[in-house]
């Protein structure tokens, strides 16, 4: 059976393909790789560089979860689609209000992935459950910088942490990604694919 794969499109955008071939897009906007029809689309907040749904080929059954559905009346929602479970979690900083932004924990095929969204270090990060992969923004302008993200990585119980959203207006900035220091760091450039393992 084929393994799940993460294709990093650049900026804050990435695509996950499950073992069964289901396709998940997170914060669509940047790069390429939107050719596969979506089964699920996750939007962490409604900034233009995270919610370009027009790039995606929708199917009749495609489900779209946006921040306004994921955080209702102060409660972070859980979604069970059968083949995947999604738990919304806090995401916020001075540029992104707690009320309008979320992160997501994705559970499928024995894996857990943390899609942090646009955020800085939050009090709640230390309380998140163990996870296989965490993707953290490190641009230092609209989100935390690489140093702060390194502190977040130490808070998380993650097997691997991947720095994304590395520079405003750029798909990927390798030099800034290198500034992210964590013993469990994985560097993934825009256009690269990672096989996800339990």
Locate each region found by the language model.
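Core dinuclear metal-dependent hydrolase active-site scaffold
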Residues: 1-36, 40, 67-129, 144, ...
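Acidic/His-rich segments in extracytoplasmic proteins that coordinate ligands and/or metal ions
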Residues: 49-65, 69-72
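Redox-cofactor binding/interface segments in oxidoreductases and associated redox assembly factors
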Residues: 42-43, 87-89, 136, 163
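Binuclear metal-ion centers of metallo-dependent hydrolases, dominated by the metallo-beta-lactamase
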Residues: 6-7, 72-75, 98, 148-198
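Short internal beta-strands
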Residues: 43, 62-69, 161-165
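Metallo-beta-lactamase
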Residues: 38-49, 105-172
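Short, conserved loop/helix-junction motifs that constitute active-site signature segments
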Residues: 34-36, 54-61, 128-129, 152-157
């Amino acid at each position: 059976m084929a393994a799940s794969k993460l294709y990093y499109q650049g900026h804050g955008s990435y695509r996950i393909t499950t073992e069964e071939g289901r396709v998940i897009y997170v914060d669509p906007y940047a790069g390429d790789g939107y050719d596969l029809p979506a089964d699920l689309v996750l939007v962490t907040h409604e900034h233009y560089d995270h919610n370009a749904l027009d790039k995606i080929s929708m199917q009749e059954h495609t489900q779209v979860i946006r921040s306004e559905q994921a955080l209702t009346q102060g409660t972070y929602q859980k979604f069970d689609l059968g083949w995947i479970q999604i738990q919304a979690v806090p995401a916020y900083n001075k540029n992104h209000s707690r009320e309008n932004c979320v992160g997501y924990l994705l559970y499928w095929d024995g894996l857990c992935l943390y899609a942090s969204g646009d955020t800085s270090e939050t009090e709640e990060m230390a309380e998140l459950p163990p996870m296989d992969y965490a993707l953290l923004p490190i641009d230092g302008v609209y989100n935390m910088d690489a140093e702060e993200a390194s502190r977040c990585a130490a808070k998380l119980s993650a097997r691997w942490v991947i720095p994304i959203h590395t520079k405003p207006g750029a798909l990927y900035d390798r030099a800034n990604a290198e500034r992210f220091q964590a013993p469990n760091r994985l560097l993934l450039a825009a256009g690269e694919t990672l096989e996800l393992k339990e």
